[in-house]
């Protein structure tokens, strides 16, 4: 979300927003929901724009990190949600809407024979790696340096390395990642097909997925 300089001065922020930011620091790690601007507190969104509590407008390039693909408060989405709310929202079992969506995805994506719904991209990547390992009966994953694949231990290998390392050695991007994970990830430089070919020649029989 950017419109102009993201570093807003105190005069651009209302007392209400300053208070909310201070409250956030007490109950949220680093005072924010994630890798977002610390002092911006969003009040509403419409289409591709959002407004903070102080009334400042931003172009929203994040769009909920993907889910708000059609923009905020889209009339058709609003209508569908309002229609469903009185009927319940989360059931953890099959429902007609989920089955219909799965059918539409399968029809739209030729290689998707079936669909598994999950709660986040991190979870989807974890399942994909697990299925690949089970099918291939191999343990290693090849990933590209700088590629974001969620917040799992495997996804956070060499995302934004803070120290130099020779390829294919992975560098963990967070504390708390077991050393054993490093042995299961092979890191390739981005946009270097020759390097990937070399790594596959060396480790191909151990790699379950790229």
Which sequence ranges carry the predicted segments?
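PLP-dependent aspartate aminotransferase-fold enzymes
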Residues: 103-208
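Active-site-adjacent loop/helix segments that line or gate small-molecule/cofactor pockets in enzymes
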Residues: 9-46
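Short, well-ordered beta-strand elements within core beta-sheets of diverse protein domains
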Residues: 44-49, 67-70, 184-187
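Glycine-rich loop-to-alpha-helix module at the N-terminal edge of alpha/beta enzyme cores
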Residues: 57-142
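Active-site and channel-lining beta-strand-loop segments
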Residues: 40-62
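Short, hydrophobic/aliphatic alpha-helical segments
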Residues: 15-23, 49-57, 107
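Short, Lys/Arg-enriched N-terminal segments with co-localized hydrophobic residues
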Residues: 1-7
